[in-house]
Amino acid sequence: MQRVAVMVLAVLLALFSAPPAWAIDPPVIDAGAVPPDETGPDQPTEQRKICATPTVMPNSNFADRPWANDYLRIQEAQKFATGAGVTVAVIDTGVNGSPRVPAEPGGDFVDAAGNGMSDCDAHGTMTAAIIGGRPSPTDGFVGMAPDVRLLSLRQTSVAFQPKGARQDPNDPNTTQTAGSIRSLARSVVHAANLGAQVINISEAACYKVTRRIDETSLGAAINYAVNVKGAVIVVAAGNTGQDCSQNPPPDPSVPSDPRGWREVQTIVSPAWYDPLVLTVGSIGQNGQPSNFSMSGPWVGAAAPGENLTSLGYDGQPVNATPGEDGPVPLNGTSFSAAYVSGLAALVKQRFPDLTPAQIINRITATARHPGGGVDNYVGAGVIDPVAALTWEIPDGPEKAPFRVKEVPPPVYIPPPDRGPITAVVIAGATLAFALGIGALARRALRRKQ
């Protein structure tokens, strides 16, 4: 009876101490799976929706500086760097260029005939403006790094859809809109090969941990851009809604997993490729994490993402998008990431010898840390551009630690030598024959006995 009780107790302990069925580990990179450097969509697309146009909230006053600029002390930071000489690639919905957002064509992965300089969603244009929008005497807006060189790569668009029926609406590789994990991987490689020193990806694909997606090419592309070409990659943490269900917080009773990898229920990509990428969450004007900002053990920093101001197609200030019931304020981790990409460009200009990992280290080490030093909503904290550009801190490791798929060395196979091989075959046949004769003899002896 005592043995049975011990066995029951052991089973109960195993049940309560075992990680959840969906527990995951950080992704593993297959460095040899880099996709080809090719533009164009995965399959032919067509436009099925009219283009969106950003708008303005009632009673807006653009003469004053946006709250995010003051919160981040952007004007003070620009005394130390403005992004001059740094190239930032914006992988997004494209950019409609203007004198205040003078982007250059970087490639189109939505329309085979495009070059990246057409934006039917406004998202890419507004993202690019927050990164590197130029100032104007008529309003108070200026981007984080107004002297950067902007490259526009159109990789997604809700206005375009692949021709024909979709195979799997739950797979980010077969989404209802133009753009996929595969085309994102190709766009990362293309941006890196164009010489981008900072790559902004204000996109997020969410899926449940119980339904794994093949991201081999994306992981390889990110590793290639960072560790081979030397680009800093900044990505959005993602917004809750649709496929993006909020992740639970870490379990304090499991100190061996302080960031809560075992609690993750929703994977966000490319956000979960931290620390190769810097994943950015959103805060509001009160400095608190935004309700819509996806959390996860991969979040590295945070920046303003609510009630923002940017520039529209014509280079004029906008702060809303059209909604069913009127204008909707400009919110989202997409724009939080844009602020951090701009800061990465400033750091790159001021400290040109730093590696991507060291630039990320400088941004996170000088951030306004939350209680406890780090959490899954704001990571190391809200960025502090002035501190990132002025504090004296250790550079940190040249490369970020990351799990890479180990490929065994090729096995040496000597050239064929017919003589020895023939001898071995003959000897083997002779041995087999001898063994066979011996077996027959033993059977005969047993029968006689």
Curated annotation (Swiss-Prot):
Transmembrane helix keyword on record: yes
InterPro entries, sorted: Peptidase_S8/S53_dom, Peptidase_S8/S53_dom_sf, Peptidase_S8_subtilisin-rel, T7SS_pept_S8A_mycosin
Domain Peptidase S8: residue ranges: 66-389
Matching Gene3D superfamilies: Peptidase S8/S53 domain
Enzyme kind, highest EC tier: hydrolase
Polar residues bias: start-end ranges: 170-179
Gene Ontology terms describing biological process: protein processing
Enzyme Commission number, as recorded: 3.4.21.-
Keywords associated with the record: Cell membrane, Disulfide bond, Hydrolase, Membrane, Protease, Serine protease, Signal, Transmembrane, Transmembrane helix
Disulfide bonds, paired cysteine numbers: C51-C120, C206-C244
GO molecular function: serine-type endopeptidase activity
UniProt similarity note: Belongs to the peptidase S8 family.
Protein name: Mycosin-1
Organism: Mycolicibacterium smegmatis (strain ATCC 700084 / mc(2)155)
Lineage: Bacteria, Bacillati, Actinomycetota, Actinomycetes, Mycobacteriales
